[in-house]
Amino acid sequence: SSFFNWWYFGICMGILTALLILNYIQDNLGWVLGFGLPCISMGFALGLLLLGTRIYRHQAPDDKCLSVRIAQVLVDALRNRLLCLFSPAGEVREPLLPRNAQFKFSDEKKAVIIVESHLSSPPLQVQAVDAASAMEEANGMVLLLPIWAACLIYAVVFAQPPTFFTKQGSTLERHIGEDFQIPPAALQGFISVTIVLFIPVYDRVLVPAGRRATGNPSGITMLQRIGIGMFLSVVSMAVAALVEMRRLRTARELGLVDAPGVALPMSLWWLVPQYVIFGVSEALTMVGLQEFFYDQVPDGLRSVGLALYMSIFGIGSLLSSFLISTIDRVTVGRGESWFSDNLNRAHLDYFYWLLAGFSVGGLVVYLYFAQSYLYKKT
């Protein structure tokens, strides 16, 4: 757990550097230098990676890939789904791992591998154990899917800060002092700053306190951490909707609705709460998901677990685009798009409230599956 905390801390430090330094360089000193510095940095990082190639540990895979074994077992299981497996003494064989009491498909003995009682030579006994083990591993992978699906709405919310939050900020007063103006994209730095400040506090203060209270080495379970982060994403969307309502009211009161190029006399600090809340949400949910999908898959499928984690945000981004395009098509037909080019005539507040509602629904579904999930025994 601590490893994933500090790993994500390092990523956010890099993001923060890019937002605070590179954005300023690109806006004020030119794009050549703005792209040249990241190129040099990546070359340096690649050199460090290559220097360590001789000391990296690499474990060769088994003769047969675990994913292939699982696929073969599933095919055989479906072929024999109506049959039961009995031991030579006539007793029903028990599952190897207790977690499958949660997985009814296996518990009902409808998905088993047939091993005839007279085929009791050691090679076949080993094959039977391997098949049963692979079935348990396949069941474990299937049990991850409801959690995966319930987190998709969080990924839709995750796609909004780099886009609409930034667009909101571009319409506000962003000057600090008389000469310095914060670039709109740099507002994302509030999320990274929050994560960089929160993770050390969480890892060094909150986790030990939680460990003493619960006895869990991580303070709270992985699913509890994810759930708290998802709840905070709901709060972040609600706060963003309230701030947007205030921004639109300011534009109407000052007669600036049709002057989108004029910065509203409303400070960018109004946006800080939604950024900070979302930053804490991201620190909890993102790290929790990484740890969960890495820890709960079979050892031979760790890369698949991380792929499942990444796919949440890939599919979530696609769902966000689909949702926005659908809403835009519907609202344009009614004469007033929620996503008008003139943000003073748009209704991002409605969109944020909609996402908050979807997030509540997603959180309820998540809690339903999370409370019954049985962790893999280590």
Question: What kind of region is each of these model predictions?
Answer:
Residues 1-378:
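Hydrophobic transmembrane alpha-helices of multi-pass solute transporters/permeases
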